[in-house]
Design a protein with these regions (language model features):
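Acidic, contiguous internal or C-terminal segments within carbohydrate-active enzymes
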Residues: 3, 97-152
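Beta-strand-rich N-terminal accessory domains
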Residues: 1-59, 63-67, 215-237, 284-295
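Acidic/His-leaning functional-site neighborhoods
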Residues: 8, 24, 69, 74-82, ...
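Extended, loop-rich substrate-binding clefts of extracytoplasmic carbohydrate-active enzymes
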Residues: 62-120
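Intrinsically disordered, low-complexity Pro/Gly/Ser/Thr-rich segments with frequent PxxP/GP/PP motifs
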Residues: 274-286
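Active-site/ligand-binding surface loops and adjacent short beta/alpha elements
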Residues: 136-138, 146-149, 153-235
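Hydrophobic residues positioned within well-ordered beta-strands of beta-sheet architectures
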Residues: 91-93, 112-114, 125, 141-143, ...
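Generic short beta-strand segments
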Residues: 94-100, 258-260, 293
Length: 296
């Protein structure tokens, strides 16, 4: 699916309903998916964000397999609508329920529609989750877009900056209360993160940075002079992840608003007690949204 207006053009793959290109005036901003570093672009994390402990979710005492970040990113979607309206170009994709064995293994039947809407130099991504089951259903959802570092040179000491904002639009120096150990959270407070954080070769030496409790709802990628290049804003975000593979010469970074988070190490509780879990009654729908805006 391809959408464009006078300023930006995006492309979305049927596989994972994944944004695979974001261009402004011919300049690409989204990571290419080069498998030498990371073979994805902007996967949708659903119905799990991060890694469940032991790759299992527990429902009423029974364990169900669930890999890191869920099944949506490896499932097929169908395009159900493309239109041009007063607010801009709009395209919607719907999860094909039969496209992945992991969908059938999940203990709840959930529908997922993903709408991409262009407005000026911004892309709004709207997720609508529907409970197709006859009992309450539980899920998490999140975004994982990767963006090219502006004017990247591997030999540079600093590759740019990330500026953090809270829900009210105020710059914030967030506090990390946990870090990752084999994909699960363990207590490891880090309190000296500035509201404008430099990106260096060692920023992600210990995996992703995670900011919990809604401290951060918007992260902005800045160039080496501190000028804002693009931002990812999600008023719903309960947690926010910043990540890149710790590999020499990695030229991108991911800005990840989450409505959910990975399990703490050793967690084996019921799915209903997972942190930042969302519950839907039968036939109920819920909508989440985030926006990518290109500034320059």
């Amino acid at each position: 699916m391809k959408l464009s207006n006078d300023i930006i053009t995006i492309e979305v793959a049927a596989h994972g309903a994944e944004l695979v290109s974001l261009r402004k005036e011919g300049c690409e901003y989204l990571w290419s998916g080069d498998p030498a570093y990371w073979n994805r672009h902007a996967p949708i994390l659903f119905p799990a964000v991060g890694k469940p402990y032991n790759n299992e979710l527990h429902v009423d005492g029974k364990a169900y397999p669930m890999k890191q970040h869920g099944y949506a990113r490896d499932s097929e979607f169908e395009c159900v609508n493309v239109a041009v309206c007063e607010c801009g170009s709009v395209g919607t994709m719907r999860l094909i329920q039969s496209s992945n064995d992991a969908i059938r293994q999940y203990p709840y039947r959930l529908g997922l529609e993903v709408c991409y809407r262009l407005s000026g130099s911004a892309v709004e991504v709207i997720w609508t989750v529907e409970n197709l089951d006859e009992r309450d259903a539980y899920f998490q959802i999140g975004a994982h877009p990767g963006f090219l570092l502006p004017d990247y040179h591997a030999e540079a000491a600093t590759h740019g900056f990330i500026r953090y904002y809270d829900r009210e639009g105020n710059p914030v120096g967030p506090v990390m209360v946990s870090a990752l150990d084999d994909g699960n959270r363990v207590p490891r407070p880090i309190v000296n993160i500035a509201d404008c954080m430099p990106i260096t070769a060692d920023t992600f030496a210990h995996d992703a940075l995670m900011f919990e409790g809604g401290q951060v709802t918007k992260a902005v990628l800045c160039d080496k002079e501190g000028r804002e290049v693009l931002g990812v804003d999600c008023p719903h975000a309960e947690a926010y992840g910043i990540w890149a593979p710790h590999k020499e010469g990695c030229p991108f970074v991911c800005l990840e608003p989450w409505c959910g988070i990975c399990d703490t190490k050793g967690f084996t509780g019921d799915i209903s007690t997972r942190q930042y879990i969302h519950r839907l009654a039968p036939k109920e729908k819920y909508t989440f949204a985030y926006t990518i805006e290109v500034y320059r």
